[in-house]
Amino acid sequence: MIPYFLNIENAMRILILSDGIPGHVNQSIGICHMLQGETNCTFEVHELAWKLHFLRSPLKIFIRFLCSFLNTFTANLIQGLFKPIMVQDFDLIVAAGGNTMALNAAVGLIHKIPNIQLGSPRGIPSRLFSVHLTSEKFDDHPSNIVFDITPNKYSPSNCSRASINFHPQDFILLLIGGDGIG
């Protein structure tokens, strides 16, 4: 199902904002793959880079604070803390993880591009995103959508095809999780 805010008449270009964490990139790619099943779209991954890398820890706190009253001025402040991102030709922004949230919200507001964010809000309101996918309900805003299975780049059909070559043996599966979305 195509979200209502997307114009699908032409090929859609999706920008993935990445914090460099492989699991977060895989979740964003999973969203893009789901959209590719519904419409003609391509995606590009852009890894975020702080202008003042040595100040990133206090700046993360600062930009989350700015998101509590996000407007064009504060969004430009947030965007200005990162190395430039060319977003003009993109129709949608997708990002996963807490390190991308503030910039995703800011870029979406400044450039009026719909955005999808995956992950727990960490104090940033769901209303700043066109779609905010979380593992549990954090916000009463309609953009906060709860899902049972985290999107990822490995589709069920790909896994089914791979299982054909699988030879059953005795295996043990160990799953380790944290307090994030994955």
Model-predicted segments: where are they?
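N-terminal amphipathic/basic-hydrophobic helices that include classical n-h-c signal peptides
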Residues: M1-E9
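Intrinsically disordered, low-complexity regions enriched in small/polar residues
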Residues: L6-N7, V45, P156, L173
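Extreme N-terminal starter segment of soluble prokaryotic enzymes
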Residues: N10-L15
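A nucleotide-sugar donor-handling region in carbohydrate enzymes
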Residues: P121, S126-G182
